UniProtKB/Swiss-Prot annotation:
This is Chaperone SurA. Keywords: Chaperone, Isomerase, Periplasm, Repeat, Rotamase, Signal. Chaperone involved in the correct folding and assembly of outer membrane proteins. Recognizes specific patterns of aromatic residues and the orientation of their side chains, which are found more frequently in integral outer membrane proteins. May act in both early periplasmic and late outer membrane-associated steps of protein maturation. Its main location: periplasm. Its EC number is 5.2.1.8. One of its GO terms (molecular function) is unfolded protein binding. It comes from Methylobacillus flagellatus (strain ATCC 51484 / DSM 6875 / VKM B-1610 / KT). The gene is surA. One of its GO terms (cellular component) is outer membrane-bounded periplasmic space. Gene3D superfamilies: 3.10.50.40, Porin chaperone SurA, peptide-binding domain. It catalyses: [protein]-peptidylproline (omega=180) = [protein]-peptidylproline (omega=0). HAMAP family: Chaperone_SurA. It is found in: Periplasm. Pfam families: Rotamase, Rotamase_3, SurA_N. SUPFAM superfamilies: FKBP-like (SSF54534), Triger factor/SurA peptide-binding domain-like (SSF109998).
Length: 437
């Protein structure tokens, strides 16, 4: 009897002991994953958040075939990104920038369509890859917020003047390599404007250490992930193909001296230290000659008060008057609901892609001075007349457009880094990553 009781108690005791240790282990794991690795103003970044992002980046790098940098280097690089993202998201929330569920749903629908899937199929595909749909939604929401925040705070405030474009093109045309294009990889060690001489020396030493690793045969993408402060550091630092007009003179001069596969020395610019790798080079593009069409139209829009049938009847009535010799420009001024109405419907010279596909298809099918039958597009009902056609050398216009885009991109990138630095300077950031060890 006593032995039976003893055995029963012992068995229950072992069970209790098992549950005690199991619960303790689970609690320890939860505590570990909830451990704070950084305090960012009023928010925190947990070890779980950091680990989740690390695993995502590792999966991306492995998919690209990129050799992984040391874990501690990757960990610190990703933590910096998380801190910067968190600061921006906090600022966005404080200033009323939000993305509602309806906007988010539309974005996810577009992503699914790009993958040729329905939203339901896309959700199943995500879950099959081990990506929780709820987390994916919040990640996309945050990406939209970050993009809109940058657009609001930086991009919309960047202006490019005609004189800046003129100076840019003058500088580029003075170089014999104007037509060259380069495929480039890039590492940036950023040097803030307020850096002291001692800090600059340390940053330069960091760049030279990265270059030494590369010269010893290290993988460029791995060194980029471990050292670079560029936005694409974890994507191998690849800039892709760039015309010489799209690159700073400092870069072009260095690249001109390289053969594919070679590395530049450490280069100093106002925003830091750079290392370039020339992946490939090719001659530039030939003159850009495009087909242009001088066209005018009459537009009848659909609205809440104008039905499809009413709009179609109205456009048919206008077409009938044109067939009987009525003046196109006069009817456009009288009836067209497009902004071109005051100009008699004249849209001027158009390039391929300037108009929606249905309009362009109908326009391209017309002879000179021929008037189309009514054409339905997303804007409503049109009547189209082609006035002239020509081939136009758009090389100069294209060069100015590319120059404007390049100047704007450079100024926006510099302004964004300055803005982000100011945001960090105003914030309280405490690192606790070392507390783990």
């Amino acid at each position: 009897m006593h032995n039976h009781v003893f055995k029963t108690i012992a068995r229950h005791g072992l069970i209790a002991l098992f549950f005690f240790f199991s619960i303790s282990a689970m609690a320890a794991e939860v505590a570990k994953m909830d451990r704070i690795v950084a305090i960012v103003d009023q928010g925190v970044i947990t070890e779980k958040e950091l680990e989740d992002r690390i695993q995502t980046v590792i999966a991306q790098l492995e998919k690209q075939g990129t050799q992984l940098p040391p874990r501690d280097v990757l960990q610190k690089q990703i933590l910096e990104r998380l801190i910067n993202d968190r600061l921006q998201l906090q600022y966005a929330a404080q200033t009323g920038l939000r993305v509602d569920d309806a906007q988010l749903d539309k974005t996810i629908e577009r992503i699914a369509e790009q993958n040729k899937l329905s939203t339901g199929e896309f959700r199943k595909a995500l879950e099959a890859e081990g990506i929780p749909y709820r987390k994916f939604r919040e990640d996309i929401r945050n990406e939209i917020i970050l993009a809109r925040l940058r657009e609001r705070e930086v991009d919309n405030r960047v202006n490019v003047t005609e004189s800046e474009i003129d100076n840019f093109l003058t500088t580029q045309s003075s170089r014999n390599d104007i037509q060259d294009e380069f495929e480039v990889a890039h590492i940036l060690i950023r040097a803030p404007e307020e850096s002291t001489p001692e800090e600059l020396q340390k940053l330069k030493a960091k760049a030279e250490a990265a270059l030494k690793e590369l010269q010893s045969g290290a993988d460029f993408a791995q060194v980029s992930a471990g050292y670079s402060d560029a936005p694409n550091a974890l994507e191998g630092g690849i800039l892709g193909w760039k015309a010489s007009s799209q690159l700073p003179s400092l870069f072009v001069d260095a690249l001109q001296a390289l053969q594919p596969g070679q590395l530049s020395p450490v280069l100093r610019s106002p925003n830091g230290y750079h290392i370039l790798k020339l992946l490939n080079r090719r001659g530039g593009s030939s003159p850009l000659v495009v087909d242009q069409t001088h066209v005018r139209h009459i537009l009848i829009k659909l609205s809440e008060v104008v039905s499809e049938l009413e709009a179609e009847q109205k456009i048919n009535s206008i077409k009938e008057r044109l067939d009987h010799g009525a003046d196109f420009a006069e009817l456009a001024r009288q009836y067209s609901e497009d902004a071109s109405a005051n100009n008699g419907g004249d849209l001027g010279w158009t390039n391929a892609g300037d108009t929606v596909p249905a309009f362009e298809k109908a326009m391209n099918a017309l002879d000179i001075n021929e008037i189309s039958a009514p054409v339905r597009t997303p804007f409503g009902w049109h009547i189209i007349q082609v006035l002239e056609r020509r081939k136009q050398d758009m090389t100069q216009e294209s060069a100015r457009l590319k120059a404007r885009q390049e100047i704007r991109a450079r100024k926006a990138d510099d302004a964004f880094q300055d803005w982000l630095s100011e945001l960090r300077d105003r914030a309280y950031v405490e690192y606790r990553l070392e507390d783990k060890y």
